[in-house]
Each structure stands twice: as C-alpha cells, then as structure tokens.
C-alpha cells in the first residue's frame, strides 16, 4: 500500500512538473467544483424534504467556487447547515484561489514551498515576481481572517434582531465570507438577498466595506498599508485601481439614483455590489431598462486584478479609456505622471474582445434555448455569469438544463479567464517569414 501511494504521488508530481501553472490552476478549480457538487448531493447536505439534482448541485458548486452568487435553488431554504458550510468553504477557496489555500496549508504543516508552488501562487495572484511569495501569502491569509472576523462581528447586531442568537452568528459568518470574496450568496432564505435590510445603515456599510476591500486586490491593500494611506507614495497600479474604483462607484450610484430614483444608500450599495459582489438591496427585476444597462456596464468592468472579483477588471477599463483620451489629446498612453508600456493596450484590447465574445456567444445560446424570455434579461444573466457578479433579474431558476450548462461554463471561463484558457490549449505557431507591412482603413 505504501509503495502504491508513493508511486501515485510520484506520478502526480511528474505530471504537475510538466504543466504550466495556469493549466494546473484551471484543473484545480474544475476538480474543486466536482468535489463540491458531490458533497452538496449528500442527503444531509439539504433540509428534510428538499431535493437537489446533480445539475443543481453542479451549478451551485460552480457558482460558489467561481464566487458568483447565481443560484437555481435558494441557499437558506434548501441546504442544511452542513450544505451551507460546504458552500462557504467553496467560496473561501474559490475567492483566495486554490494555489494560495494550498500554500497556506503547507505553511501550517511546516512544509517547504517548492518553486512550482510559488509559480502557481504568482499566477493565481497575478503578480510579477516570485520574491517574497511566502510572506505575501501569509499576509493575505491574515488579512482575510481579520477582515472576515471583523465583518462577522459587525454584521451580527443586524441579523440578531430577526434571528435566534446561534443562527445570527452563523448568518454573520456566512455573510462576511460571501461579501469579502465578492460572492452574492446569502443564507437568509426567501430568495430576497439583502432586500429586508435595505435601510440597515450598519449592514449596508459593513457589506460595502467587505466587498470593496475584497474587490480592489490584495496587492493594493498591502500597498495602501505600506504607504499609510498617503496617495502620492502609492504605486501606479494602486493609484489606478483606487481612482477607477471611486469613479465607477460614485458614477454608478449617481446614474442609478437618476434612472430609478433610488435612495442614495440603496444606489451606492447597488453600484458597489454590481461590480461582482451579487448582493441586492432592491428587486433587480423591477429596475428600469436604463438602470439595468448601468448595472450591466458595471458588472462587465468588474473588480481589480489579484482580487476575489471578476469582470474585465478596472485596470483594463482604465487603459482603454486612456487610449480614447490619447487619440484626442495626442498624448502618450498613461496617467499619474507615468507612461504605460506598449503592450498594455494590446493586452487590454484582447481581454475586452474575449469578454465580448464570451458574452455574445453565451447570450446567443441562451436566446436559442430560451426563446420565450426577454433578450435584455438573458444578456443581463450572461454578463452576470461572465463577470462572476451574481445579480439576476429572477430568471435563473426558470432556465432549462442546457441553459444552466451555458451559465456553468460561462462562470468557469469568467473566473479562470478567457485569455488564460485559450492560451493553454491553443498551440503557438512556429515563427514564419516576415511579410511586408501595409495599412488598412479603420473606422
């Protein structure tokens, strides 16, 4: 038995050694989803009398691991405490990343971190250097623990007013994990998300803070701490993320206030949660078409690199907007007295184009499969799945099995990254002869 175990371990080690980090991460997410689905299908994972089909379990596990929040069955009404705990763990691992959690467990066990392990974490966190990777993971795990414990403690008074003490404790923990990891799950039951708490100032502000901190990226948080909040000392990346986040947050709130006459607290909350969090303090299905368009744009842009959120990312949006500005101002691409590298625009454009292609193909498939549903609602659902936002106009549970599979694939692509997945399985062509350059008319 020991020899068999050693042989299997060596075979896995040899296999992983020859695989690029991004492929290992993608496979790791897929295996975690399958494991989560299997656990959610256990009889004691659901309430007595409730039933979860294999597809529903797979959808829920995918939504949790990809920190989305779209659901086909209500989390609180369907899943038992065990099932909800499984979902919370999947959210936590999915938000921080399989590689980061794996390194954290290895550090706790006192094991040495290999170069391959450090490369996996670098790929997962989207950082440039391998230097200080162990210290970085320790800081991220500690920061996550502090934020989630503080969030749970501050959320408790709001939930304690409507629930028994022990249940309020669990709801606070579950909500804090979901909010920090930008996953729109709630265990309240009734399918209302946070609508009953739309006027609860404390819970709204705590949720806002958790979502924003989780969505701006771990490197940004550490840089803000290093600079003690002094904006001029921060890195170019941090300045871009913070300024773009502020513009989107305030701009989205103003537009939602104007289009749907939301109160400022609700508009601010909805603008924040649209960018990949998935919570809702208003009925999304009742929002006007103009308001839905604002939310779709915010969802598509999403969070920031190296964070728990999805979308094309705030930095991509910044680069594209700077390119538009540079066309009219005739200035070089950049900002904050810094010039962007030449490859930044092509990468941003590729990410944007791939995102539009995934959303377009997915929406087309949903339109074919669900001809009875409104195009705008199907587009909203697809963007929500791709950006791992988790907001819905209320049609998720009505979708046919094939449509649910489309959303499962979209959520997975959105979490791992369309460009990353494409680069893993598309072989690079061998260098060919250089051809003569010639212009074409564009626009």
Locations of the language-model features?
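Membrane-proximal intracellular helices of multi-pass ion channels
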Residues: 1-443
């Amino acid at each position: 038995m020991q020899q068999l175990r050693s042989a299997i371990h060596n075979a896995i080690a040899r296999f992983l050694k020859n695989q690029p980090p991004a492929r290992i991460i993608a496979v790791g997410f897929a295996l975690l989803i399958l494991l989560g689905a299997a656990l959610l299908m256990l009889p004691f994972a659901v309430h007595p009398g409730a039933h979860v089909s294999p597809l529903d379990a797979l959808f829920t596990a995918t939504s949790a691991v990809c920190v989305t929040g779209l659901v086909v069955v209500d989390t609180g009404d369907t899943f038992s405490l065990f099932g909800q705990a499984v979902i919370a763990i999947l959210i936590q691992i999915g938000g921080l990343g399989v590689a980061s959690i794996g390194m954290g467990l290895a550090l706790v066990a006192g094991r040495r971190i290999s170069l391959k392990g450090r490369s996996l974490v670098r790929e997962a966190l989207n950082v440039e250097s391998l230097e200080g990777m162990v210290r970085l993971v320790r800081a991220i795990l500690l920061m996550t623990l502090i934020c989630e414990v503080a969030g749970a403690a501050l959320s408790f008074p709001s939930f304690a007013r409507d629930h028994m003490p022990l249940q309020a404790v669990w709801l606070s923990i579950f909500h804090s994990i979901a909010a920090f990891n930008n996953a729109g799950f709630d265990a309240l039951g009734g399918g209302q998300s946070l609508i009953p708490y739309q006027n609860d100032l404390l819970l709204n502000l705590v949720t806002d803070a958790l979502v924003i901190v989780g969505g701006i990226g771990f490197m940004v948080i550490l840089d803000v701490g290093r600079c003690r909040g002094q904006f001029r000392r921060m890195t170019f990346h941090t300045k871009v993320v913070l300024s773009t986040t502020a513009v989107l947050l305030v701009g989205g709130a103003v537009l939602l206030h104007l289009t749907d006459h939301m109160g400022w607290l609700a508009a601010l909350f909805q603008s924040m949660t649209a960018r990949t969090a998935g919570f809702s303090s208003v009925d999304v299905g009742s929002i006007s078409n103009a308001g839905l368009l604002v939310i779709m744009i915010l969802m598509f842009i999403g969070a920031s690199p190296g964070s728990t959120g999805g979308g094309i990312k705030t930095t991509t949006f910044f680069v594209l907007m700077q390119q538009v500005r540079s066309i009219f101002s005739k200035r070089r691409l950049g900002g904050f007295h810094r010039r962007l590298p030449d490859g930044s625009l092509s990468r941003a454009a590729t990410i944007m184009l791939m995102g539009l292609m995934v959303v377009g193909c997915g929406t087309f498939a949903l339109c074919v499969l669900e001809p009875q549903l409104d195009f705008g609602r199907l587009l909203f659902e697809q963007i929500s799945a791709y950006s791992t936002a988790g907001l819905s106009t209320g049609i998720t549970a009505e979708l046919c099995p094939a449509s649910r599979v489309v959303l499962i694939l979209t959520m997975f692509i959105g979490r791992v990254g369309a460009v990353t997945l494409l680069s893993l399985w598309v072989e690079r062509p061998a260098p060919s002869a250089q051809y003569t350059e010639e212009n074409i008319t564009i626009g």
